[in-house]
Regions:
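Conserved catalytic alpha/beta core of Sir2/sirtuin-type deacylases, generalized to analogous enzyme cores
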Residues: 1-178
Length: 178
Protein backbone atom coordinates (compact mmCIF):
# COMPACT_ATOMS: atom_id res chain seq x y z
CA UNK A 1 0.00 0.00 0.00
CA UNK A 2 2.66 2.56 1.04
CA UNK A 3 4.91 1.61 -1.87
CA UNK A 4 2.06 2.41 -4.28
CA UNK A 5 1.30 5.70 -2.51
CA UNK A 6 5.01 6.64 -2.58
CA UNK A 7 5.16 5.90 -6.32
CA UNK A 8 2.07 8.05 -6.92
CA UNK A 9 3.53 10.92 -4.90
CA UNK A 10 6.86 10.77 -6.72
CA UNK A 11 5.26 10.53 -10.16
CA UNK A 12 4.73 14.26 -10.35
CA UNK A 13 1.90 15.20 -7.98
CA UNK A 14 2.10 18.96 -7.51
CA UNK A 15 1.10 21.33 -4.70
CA UNK A 16 -2.12 23.25 -5.28
CA UNK A 17 -2.77 26.99 -5.10
CA UNK A 18 -3.46 26.80 -1.33
CA UNK A 19 0.03 25.39 -0.70
CA UNK A 20 1.55 28.19 -2.77
CA UNK A 21 -0.44 30.89 -0.96
CA UNK A 22 0.87 29.61 2.38
CA UNK A 23 4.41 30.06 1.02
CA UNK A 24 3.48 33.60 -0.03
CA UNK A 25 2.08 34.34 3.44
CA UNK A 26 5.26 33.02 5.00
CA UNK A 27 7.12 35.96 3.43
CA UNK A 28 5.10 38.40 5.57
CA UNK A 29 4.13 36.34 8.62
CA UNK A 30 5.63 33.71 10.89
CA UNK A 31 3.83 30.51 9.93
CA UNK A 32 4.20 27.01 11.36
CA UNK A 33 2.43 24.27 9.43
CA UNK A 34 1.26 21.20 11.31
CA UNK A 35 -0.06 18.71 8.80
CA UNK A 36 -1.81 15.37 9.03
CA UNK A 37 -0.96 14.73 5.37
CA UNK A 38 1.85 12.27 4.70
CA UNK A 39 2.78 13.78 1.34
CA UNK A 40 5.52 16.39 1.08
CA UNK A 41 3.52 18.94 -0.88
CA UNK A 42 4.25 21.72 1.63
CA UNK A 43 7.99 21.15 1.19
CA UNK A 44 7.65 20.96 -2.60
CA UNK A 45 5.78 24.27 -2.61
CA UNK A 46 8.54 25.91 -0.55
CA UNK A 47 7.13 26.16 2.98
CA UNK A 48 9.87 26.02 5.59
CA UNK A 49 8.40 25.30 9.04
CA UNK A 50 6.47 22.03 8.77
CA UNK A 51 5.62 19.28 11.25
CA UNK A 52 4.27 16.05 9.79
CA UNK A 53 2.34 14.70 12.76
CA UNK A 54 1.42 11.52 10.85
CA UNK A 55 4.81 11.05 9.22
CA UNK A 56 5.98 11.18 5.62
CA UNK A 57 5.70 8.79 2.69
CA UNK A 58 9.23 9.55 1.53
CA UNK A 59 10.80 8.45 4.81
CA UNK A 60 11.32 5.12 6.56
CA UNK A 61 12.43 4.34 10.08
CA UNK A 62 13.90 1.52 12.13
CA UNK A 63 11.41 -0.55 14.13
CA UNK A 64 13.88 -0.80 17.02
CA UNK A 65 14.99 2.84 17.23
CA UNK A 66 12.49 5.45 16.06
CA UNK A 67 15.23 8.09 15.87
CA UNK A 68 16.75 6.26 12.89
CA UNK A 69 14.77 7.95 10.11
CA UNK A 70 15.88 7.94 6.46
CA UNK A 71 14.77 9.54 3.20
CA UNK A 72 13.27 6.80 1.00
CA UNK A 73 11.96 6.96 -2.56
CA UNK A 74 11.96 3.29 -3.58
CA UNK A 75 9.77 0.32 -2.71
CA UNK A 76 10.26 -0.96 0.83
CA UNK A 77 10.18 -4.64 1.77
CA UNK A 78 11.43 -6.95 4.51
CA UNK A 79 14.93 -7.13 2.98
CA UNK A 80 15.60 -3.48 3.83
CA UNK A 81 17.38 -3.22 7.16
CA UNK A 82 18.44 -0.32 9.35
CA UNK A 83 22.05 0.57 8.51
CA UNK A 84 22.71 1.32 12.20
CA UNK A 85 21.43 -1.86 13.86
CA UNK A 86 20.19 -4.24 11.15
CA UNK A 87 16.55 -4.21 12.32
CA UNK A 88 13.57 -4.15 9.98
CA UNK A 89 12.60 -0.82 8.40
CA UNK A 90 9.02 0.43 8.15
CA UNK A 91 7.28 3.42 6.58
CA UNK A 92 7.69 6.57 8.68
CA UNK A 93 3.91 6.85 8.88
CA UNK A 94 1.72 6.89 11.97
CA UNK A 95 -0.37 3.71 11.87
CA UNK A 96 -3.85 3.55 13.37
CA UNK A 97 -3.62 3.45 17.17
CA UNK A 98 -0.12 4.95 17.33
CA UNK A 99 0.57 8.33 18.91
CA UNK A 100 1.20 11.02 16.27
CA UNK A 101 4.72 12.37 16.01
CA UNK A 102 6.20 15.48 17.61
CA UNK A 103 3.26 16.19 19.94
CA UNK A 104 5.50 18.00 22.46
CA UNK A 105 6.82 20.30 19.74
CA UNK A 106 3.26 20.92 18.50
CA UNK A 107 2.15 21.82 22.03
CA UNK A 108 5.10 24.22 22.41
CA UNK A 109 4.21 25.94 19.14
CA UNK A 110 0.60 26.26 20.29
CA UNK A 111 1.73 28.04 23.44
CA UNK A 112 3.72 30.57 21.41
CA UNK A 113 1.47 31.33 18.45
CA UNK A 114 -1.18 34.03 18.26
CA UNK A 115 -3.66 32.51 15.77
CA UNK A 116 -4.81 28.99 14.91
CA UNK A 117 -5.96 28.29 11.35
CA UNK A 118 -7.37 24.88 10.41
CA UNK A 119 -7.37 24.13 6.68
CA UNK A 120 -9.18 21.29 4.93
CA UNK A 121 -10.03 18.82 7.67
CA UNK A 122 -13.17 17.09 8.90
CA UNK A 123 -12.34 17.83 12.52
CA UNK A 124 -12.81 14.17 13.40
CA UNK A 125 -9.24 12.90 13.70
CA UNK A 126 -7.73 13.26 17.16
CA UNK A 127 -5.56 14.59 18.61
CA UNK A 128 -5.48 17.19 15.79
CA UNK A 129 -9.23 17.79 16.11
CA UNK A 130 -8.62 18.91 19.68
CA UNK A 131 -6.16 21.68 18.76
CA UNK A 132 -8.98 24.21 18.38
CA UNK A 133 -10.09 23.52 21.98
CA UNK A 134 -6.56 24.15 23.21
CA UNK A 135 -6.51 27.53 21.49
CA UNK A 136 -9.96 28.44 22.80
CA UNK A 137 -8.79 27.67 26.35
CA UNK A 138 -5.85 30.02 25.80
CA UNK A 139 -8.25 32.67 24.46
CA UNK A 140 -6.49 32.77 21.09
CA UNK A 141 -8.44 33.39 17.86
CA UNK A 142 -9.32 30.40 15.68
CA UNK A 143 -10.14 30.20 11.97
CA UNK A 144 -11.57 27.35 9.92
CA UNK A 145 -10.89 27.23 6.16
CA UNK A 146 -12.74 24.20 4.91
CA UNK A 147 -14.99 22.98 2.13
CA UNK A 148 -17.81 22.53 4.61
CA UNK A 149 -18.28 23.02 8.36
CA UNK A 150 -16.15 20.56 10.32
CA UNK A 151 -17.40 18.41 13.19
CA UNK A 152 -16.02 20.97 15.65
CA UNK A 153 -16.96 24.09 13.67
CA UNK A 154 -18.80 25.68 16.60
CA UNK A 155 -15.44 26.21 18.36
CA UNK A 156 -14.05 28.44 15.61
CA UNK A 157 -14.29 32.23 15.79
CA UNK A 158 -14.31 32.70 12.03
CA UNK A 159 -14.80 30.42 9.03
CA UNK A 160 -14.69 30.39 5.25
CA UNK A 161 -16.42 27.32 3.83
CA UNK A 162 -15.17 26.97 0.28
CA UNK A 163 -12.57 24.80 -1.48
CA UNK A 164 -9.16 25.25 0.16
CA UNK A 165 -7.70 26.99 -2.88
CA UNK A 166 -10.44 29.66 -2.67
CA UNK A 167 -10.72 29.85 1.13
CA UNK A 168 -6.97 30.25 1.69
CA UNK A 169 -6.78 33.02 -0.90
CA UNK A 170 -9.73 34.87 0.68
CA UNK A 171 -8.12 34.49 4.10
CA UNK A 172 -4.79 35.79 2.77
CA UNK A 173 -6.52 38.87 1.37
CA UNK A 174 -8.27 39.48 4.69
CA UNK A 175 -5.21 39.04 6.84
CA UNK A 176 -2.85 41.08 4.69
CA UNK A 177 -5.25 44.03 4.50
CA UNK A 178 -5.81 44.16 8.30
Amino acid sequence: FYNKRRQELNSGIKPNKAHNILVELEKSLEINIITQNIDNLHEISGSSSIIHMHGELNKVRCIMDESHIFEWYENLDETHKCPHCGAQMRPHVCFYGEMPYQMDEIHNLAMECSLFVSIGTSGGTYPAAGFVSLFKEMKKPTVELNLEPSLNQSQFDFAIHKPATVAVEEFKNLILTN
